[in-house]
Amino acid sequence: MLNEFIYPDKIFWEEKTDTYGRLVVEPLERGFGTTVGNSLRRVLLSSISGTAITAVKIYGIYHEFSAIEGVQEDAIELIANLKKIKFLMKGDSDVEILYLQKKGEGEVKASDIKTPPNVEILNPDQYIATITDPNKELNIEIRVERGRGYVPVEEMEAIGEVGWILVDADFSPVKKVGFRVDNVRVGKKSTYERLTLEIFTNGIKTPDQCMQEAIEILKKHYELLENIFTEKPTVPQKVAVDELAEKLSLSIEELDISQRALNSLKRIGITTIGDLVRMTEDELKSTKNIGRKALAEIKEALHKLGLELGMNIETQR
C-alpha cells in the first residue's frame, strides 16, 4: 500500500540574530532530515558569495616579508589585521579599490580607510597597525572583491601593476554550520524527523540571507535536472541561424562578467562575442591577466547564451 508522502508544514527560525540562526523544519520522512540537512550544510559552507580583500599595496615595500619603516608591525602582520576587516559591498560592483592614508604616531584602525558610498565597514574599530614615527605617513591601497568560497594566492589573477601583494581570500560569510535530526510524532507514527539547522555567519550576511541563497543554488540545479524530461520544441533552422548571428554580433559588454575580465578581453582585441567564441580555452588560459576565475566567469556567461569557447562558427551558419 502506497502511503501519502509527508512534507514539512512547520518551518521557522527558533532563534535568529545578524550572525546566528537556528532553523527548524518538520515533519520530514525518515532519512530526509539528513538528506536535506547535509545538502544545505555543504552549499552553505562552500557556495555563498561574500566579500574579501584580495590584494594590498603598501607604499614603500614590494613584498610581504618586508619591515615597514616607522610602523610597529611588519607587512605580514599588517596584512593579517587587514584581512580581519568585514566589508559589505552594495550595488553591482564586483571590485573596489579603497585607500588608507594616516600620518603621525598612533593606532591605525579600519575606520581610517576611505570607502566609496557602496562599501561599508562593519567593524570600524578593527586594529590595523601602530605608527611609531611622528613623521611617518602610511599609505595603503586595498583591493576588495566579491567572490565565493576560499581562493588561495596561487589561484589569484596576477595584477600587472608593481607593488600589489596578493592575499588569500576567504569570501564565505558562513563560518560554521551544524544540524541535528530528531524523531517527531505525526498522528500515531513516531518515525518522522525534525531537522534543526544552525548557521553562524560573520555578519556580512545574515543567516536567513545565506539560507535563501543556498536554497536558490540547489533549486537551480534541480530545475536543470528536471529539464531533461521536458521535450524541447524544434527551432526552425533559419531562425536558429539568425539568432546565432545576432548573438555573435553582440559586444562583449553584454556578457554577465566582471569589469576586470571585460578589460582583460579588450586588451587582447576581443570586442564581440563572435571574436570570443572563436578562441579556445587553451588560448585564453595563455593570455596575460585571464586567470582561472575570469575564465570560469567567461565560460558561464557564454553557457547562458548557449555558446562556448572554440566554436567553429563558419560550420554553424
UniProtKB/Swiss-Prot annotation:
Keyword Nucleotidyltransferase: yes
Gene Ontology biological-process annotations: DNA-templated transcription
Listed SUPFAM superfamilies: C-terminal domain of RNA polymerase alpha subunit, Insert subdomain of RNA polymerase alpha subunit, RBP11-like subunits of RNA polymerase
Entry GO CC: cytoplasm; DNA-directed RNA polymerase complex
Keywords: DNA-directed RNA polymerase, Nucleotidyltransferase, Transcription, Transferase
InterPro entries: DNA-dir_RNA_pol_insert, DNA-dir_RNA_pol_RpoA/D/Rpb3, DNA-dir_RpoA, RBP11-like, RNAP_asu_C, RNApol_insert_sf
Molecular function, one GO term: DNA-directed RNA polymerase activity
Top-level EC class as recorded in UniProt: transferase
Region span, Alpha C-terminal domain (alpha-CTD): 245-317
Enzyme Commission number(s): 2.7.7.6
Catalysed reaction, written as an equation: RNA(n) + a ribonucleoside 5'-triphosphate = RNA(n+1) + diphosphate
Chain intervals for the UniProt region annotation (Alpha N-terminal domain (alpha-NTD)): 1-229
Record text on subunit structure and interactions: Homodimer. The RNAP catalytic core consists of 2 alpha, 1 beta, 1 beta' and 1 omega subunit. When a sigma factor is associated with the core the holoenzyme is formed, which can initiate transcription.
Function: DNA-dependent RNA polymerase catalyzes the transcription of DNA into RNA using the four ribonucleoside triphosphates as substrates.
UniProt comment concerning the protein's domains: The N-terminal domain is essential for RNAP assembly and basal transcription, whereas the C-terminal domain is involved in interaction with transcriptional regulators and with upstream promoter elements.
Family, as annotated: Belongs to the RNA polymerase alpha chain family.
Name the UniProt record assigns to this protein: DNA-directed RNA polymerase subunit alpha
Lineage start: Bacteria, Pseudomonadati, Aquificota, Aquificia, Aquificales
